[in-house]
């Protein structure tokens, strides 16, 4: 599976604290090796739109939408904001 990021994701990422950016990079590397790794808690959260969630460190999540064999990451932020999106 190939990963891409939206402009919104990149803007949100740039505003994250440096330690969270590091966690995001580590999570992405892990995702590239094994999307099913239990540390990512990669799961479908919206069946109708093929939207998935992945853990980024302890307090952050990233959201992506599957499009064929690709995933487009479109949101990253604190778990509290993630809960509001659901």
Q: In which residue ranges do the predicted regions lie?
A:
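Enriched for short, Lys/Arg-rich terminal
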Residues: 2-4, 11, 18, 56-86
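A short, surface-exposed loop/turn module that caps and links secondary-structure elements
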Residues: 29-54
């Amino acid at each position: 599976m190939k990963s891409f990021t939206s402009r919104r994701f990149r803007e949100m990422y740039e505003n994250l604290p440096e330690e969270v950016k590091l966690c995001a990079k580590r999570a992405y590397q892990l995702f590239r090796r094994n999307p099913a790794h239990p540390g990512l808690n990669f799961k479908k959260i919206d069946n109708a739109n093929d939207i998935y969630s992945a853990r980024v460190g302890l307090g952050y999540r990233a959201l992506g939408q599957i499009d064929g064999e690709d995933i487009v990451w479109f949101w990253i932020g604190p778990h509290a904001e993630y809960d509001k999106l659901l």
